[in-house]
């Protein structure tokens, strides 16, 4: 876990202001204000259907907010933007943020190495030799360096997800969004992905993580954000939120999680 006082000495890398998102008459996000500092790992937790994944998708404009503003590393996007101005800002923002999804979305007909090099070459214009070197560097960081010639069908779900993480890192994002990346994995494979994410957090990668893995949120996150009903109900240092939650809804959530936990 990184040191919170040092992180907060600098301006935030990500600033969300007054984010709202509705689908028709269904209001999903209701005025989200949030900051994430460089080097910080922030875990977003809460009941299903409370807007956590929608919030991540608004950060990189996969879903356009109904109102509000996203500012990332000096790039500002406002919900009222349209046309060329909006498209230019979207391109600038997406060059600074990466996202790892629940599904791995690897190209099935590409090797592991090519999966990690393809975006570098086609999107960033990186020299193929340089892209391969960088791909091997990030595959090593996620402990997949011995699998570069294999194809996705030859990998376990956990291995595919680690390749997806390497592919995202190779694009050089300032911030990485993780959207419930272990939810599609067999239980025995979850640990290898969480351990990879823990190592990235220890290395200082800036991470905004939606997760149902409460142990990860508690032990790895610098800060925990509890969402309920489209709002941020509570946030603070992980240990404080888990040990001494302020709001009744947060306490009820943790009580339910504890009652629902089964041990073998």
Segments (PLM) and residue ranges:
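ABC-family P-loop ATPase nucleotide-binding domain
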Residues: 1-20, 261-264
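C-terminal boundary and immediately downstream tail of ABC-type ATPase nucleotide-binding domains
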Residues: 2, 239-264
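ABC family nucleotide-binding domain
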Residues: 12-16, 20-238
